[in-house]
């Protein structure tokens, strides 16, 4: 298998941004032509929606509560043989997630590597709701730290099925998450595709309005 390190380097240099994704954006032009390469389109019908029992609180060993976290999986291109394909996972951010557009470039690239393609919805968004209500007490569990641990717990389960190398992908806030994940969990992810990752967020960013 070709090394995923080369993909991580390519991702860092990629000019196309996945930030603030409209998941249909990349369906407007054939990305294979845009990038000057002959890459396969991804059929959205090959993605299957599932749920995963993730932990509500990853930092309290006495709390065994779980919630249904939504994800999508596409094994159409996955090489399960001796040369196992990698796992390419797109991290959804602060929005209701849906199946990616057919021409999402990282997934098109993943298909050429025989990758399992995954999409994970962020806790507290879409159908991935740990609680029935958004009380202040419950919203205490809405944090990047818990979301990163969600991703680690989820990928741990996926790697038990197939111990594949993992590339995490995201843009804007999920781009930051992909970079943070690679830094925090280098034993899980071999690389990170961070497009416009907000890795140094500022709470009171008053310069933005100037």
Please identify what each model-predicted range represents.
Residues 124-138, 203:
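Glycine-rich "HGGG/HGxG" loop immediately N-terminal to the catalytic nucleophile
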Residues 162-172:
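Alpha/beta-hydrolase fold nucleophile elbow
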Residues 173-186, 192, 199:
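Short glycine-enriched nucleophile-adjacent loop
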Residues 95, 123-126, 199:
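Alpha/beta-hydrolase active-site loop signature
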Residues 139-159:
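Alpha/beta-hydrolase active-site loop
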Residues 112-129:
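Conserved alpha/beta-hydrolase
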Residues 188-210:
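A catalytic-pocket lid/entrance helix-loop region that shapes and gates access to the active site
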Residues 5-8, 13-116, 141:
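Catalytic-loop region of hydrolases
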